[in-house]
Amino acid sequence: MAQPELLWAAAGLMLLGVAVSACVRCQLYATKRGKDGSQGSRLERPQRFEVIRSCSAVTRRPERIKEPEHLARKAPEELSTSCHVGFESSAEPRYQNFLTEDCLHEDAAYVEPVPLDYYSHNRFFSPPNDEDSHSYQNVIIGDPCSSELDDAEDYENSTAIEVWKVQQAKAMLYAESQDEEPDYVNTDPTIDAVVLSK
């Protein structure tokens, strides 16, 4: 064999040995970890169940609060007034001033929460009960007033409108008088211009 071939064979065997030793170490580590994990999980499982099944209740009773010896115990009347007054002295810790149920009922500044009916908009979408629900409030039912005279004064070309109305009336009379009715009536544009210029 040649020398380069021997070097390649030796390098391949070394790589194969490293791979086998890595696999053996991983397998030993996994079995060791599995044994330790199973023993640890056996020890941890009862504790987990105890934590899940245990429960604690928190109560707020002034009689059972442990206070430092240098602070005097407040009477219930003082506690109810202290919840209204607030944090007056900075010598007392903040957690001593807690609200009792009586304070919420006696507090004049307490505002009841908004009821859910306030936010329901059903009253806006329901039809009104009046029989005249579709009429407008600002419409006066009565004789219709003719606004033709008022409209004539509003426009600058009111004279042209009056001339046009007269011509339309003449055209209608002319059309009715003839046996065959034309689709339209041709009028002389110079006559209209003379009338408009007056």
Curated annotation (Swiss-Prot):
PTM info: Phosphorylated on tyrosines following cross-linking of BCR; which induces the recruitment of GRB2.
Membrane topology: Single-pass type III membrane protein
Modified positions (Phosphotyrosine) in chain numbering: Y136, Y155, Y184
Pfam families hit by this protein: LAT2
Keywords: Adaptive immunity, Cell membrane, Immunity, Lipoprotein, Mast cell degranulation, Membrane, Palmitate, Phosphoprotein, Signal-anchor, Transmembrane, Transmembrane helix
Superkingdom as given in the UniProt entry: Eukaryota
Residues in compartment: Extracellular: 1-4
Cytoplasmic side: 25-198
Subcellular location: Cell membrane
GO CC term, one of those recorded: plasma membrane
GO biological process: adaptive immune response; B cell activation; B cell receptor signaling pathway; calcium-mediated signaling; mast cell degranulation
Outcome of substituting C26A: Abolishes phosphorylation following BCR activation
Membrane-spanning intervals of the chain: 5-24
Lipidation (S-palmitoyl cysteine): C23, C26
InterPro entries attached to this UniProt entry: LAT2
Function: Involved in BCR (B-cell antigen receptor)-mediated signaling in B-cells. May also be involved in FCER1 (high affinity immunoglobulin epsilon receptor)-mediated signaling in mast cells and FCGR1 (high affinity immunoglobulin gamma Fc receptor I)-mediated signaling in myeloid cells. Couples activation of these receptors and their associated kinases with distal intracellular events such as calcium mobilization through the recruitment of GRB2.
Self-association state and partner proteins as the record states: When phosphorylated, interacts with GRB2.
Name of the molecule in the record: Linker for activation of T-cells family member 2
Gene that this polypeptide is encoded by: LAT2
